[in-house]
UniProtKB/Swiss-Prot annotation:
This is Myeloid differentiation primary response protein MyD88. Residues 32-109 form the Death domain. Adapter protein involved in the Toll-like receptor and IL-1 receptor signaling pathway in the innate immune response. Acts via IRAK1, IRAK2 and TRAF6, leading to NF-kappa-B activation, cytokine secretion and the inflammatory response. Increases IL-8 transcription. Involved in IL-18-mediated signaling pathway. Activates IRF1 resulting in its rapid migration into the nucleus to mediate an efficient induction of IFN-beta, NOS2/INOS, and IL12A genes. Upon TLR8 activation by GU-rich single-stranded RNA (GU-rich RNA) derived from viruses, induces IL1B release through NLRP3 inflammasome activation. Keywords: Cytoplasm, Immunity, Inflammatory response, Innate immunity, Nucleus, Phosphoprotein, Ubl conjugation. One of its GO terms (molecular function) is TIR domain binding. GO terms for cellular component: cytoplasm; nucleus; plasma membrane. The gene is MYD88. The lineage of its organism: Eukaryota, Metazoa, Chordata, Craniata, Vertebrata. It is found in: Cytoplasm; Nucleus. The keyword ATP-binding does not apply. Homodimer. Also forms heterodimers with TIRAP. Binds to TLR2, TLR4, TLR5, IRAK1, IRAK2 and IRAK4 via their respective TIR domains. Interacts with IL18R1. Interacts with BMX, IL1RL1, IKBKE and IRF7. Interacts with LRRFIP1 and LRRFIP2; this interaction positively regulates Toll-like receptor (TLR) signaling in response to agonist. Interacts with FLII. LRRFIP1 and LRRFIP2 compete with FLII for MYD88-binding. Interacts with IRF1. Upon IL1B treatment, forms a complex with PELI1, IRAK1, IRAK4 and TRAF6; this complex recruits MAP3K7/TAK1, TAB1 and TAB2 to mediate NF-kappa-B activation. Ubiquitinated; undergoes 'Lys-63'-linked polyubiquitination. OTUD4 specifically hydrolyzes 'Lys-63'-linked polyubiquitinated MYD88. Deubiquitinated by USP3 that cleaves 'Lys-63'-linked ubiquitin chains leading to inhibition of MYD88-induced NF-kappa-B signaling. GO terms for biological process: defense response to Gram-positive bacterium; defense response to virus; inflammatory response; innate immune response; MyD88-dependent toll-like receptor signaling pathway; positive regulation of canonical NF-kappaB signal transduction; positive regulation of interleukin-1 beta production; positive regulation of NLRP3 inflammasome complex assembly.
Amino acid sequence: MAEGVPRAGSALPAASLSSLPLAALNVRVRRRLSLFLNVRAPVAADWTVLAEAMDFEYLEIQQLEKYADPTSRLLDDWQRRPGASVGRLLELLAKLGRDDVLMELGPSIEEDCQKYILKQQQEASEKPLQVDSIDSSITRINDMAGITIRDDPLGQKPECFDAFICYCPSDIEFVHEMIRQLEQTNYRLKLCVSDRDVLPGTCVWSIASELIEKRCRRMVVVVSDEYLQSKECDFQTKFALSLSPGAHQKRLIPIKYKPMKKEFPSILRFITVCDYTNPCTQNWFWTRLAKALSMP
């Protein structure tokens, strides 16, 4: 693997990853890859860019576009070609700048690879193989239990929210205003604000994915010039869009609260914006936003 390529984990050397076939990756990992790569966006490399890096020709990519899950089909076709491996896939994702995918799926990929190696060893020996050190590394504890202030540490009753707030540190004052207007009024909404509600010590990508997908009914994006420079906000926005392609579930709500020098992000242009900068509609702003967040 090339220098700087994030590996699935230190337990497996790069040479092992390079020799492991894609068959080592299970359905769950493949589905998560599809969530990241099926979204067509000009600001991030999608499955078509990955296909080109895998040396698929234009006509082949056109054929893949006919499938509901082109990423899954791409991986199926590529794994039959020479040189396809888990390590090569990670290397290509790194070259395409998809560090968000590598950070989020790294632990799951390592787990799949360990299981695959263990299974191969068992089949080769033709008898059950008990390796405590490997078994213990495969057994995963629910590391998403106890990630927020009011979470049940045992994971029996995870804390849920009306909306996840995607914001930059420089926009924290407006987030405080959101808390005052939406939580401390008759609306009584429950917002997930990372700096206030999330406990330290866990991967930021994993926490964001868990909260956006499973714990929050909506996501509010505080758009600003600083937002456009944030990799964390970029990941959160693309992940939320991947859960609701075309905004059919009205899951994501962009907010423009101050004038911008830079162009509004194209990935959000097709979604209705709550514009706090328009003095003609400012009196209706909080009512509209609260109503949108209260919808089932």
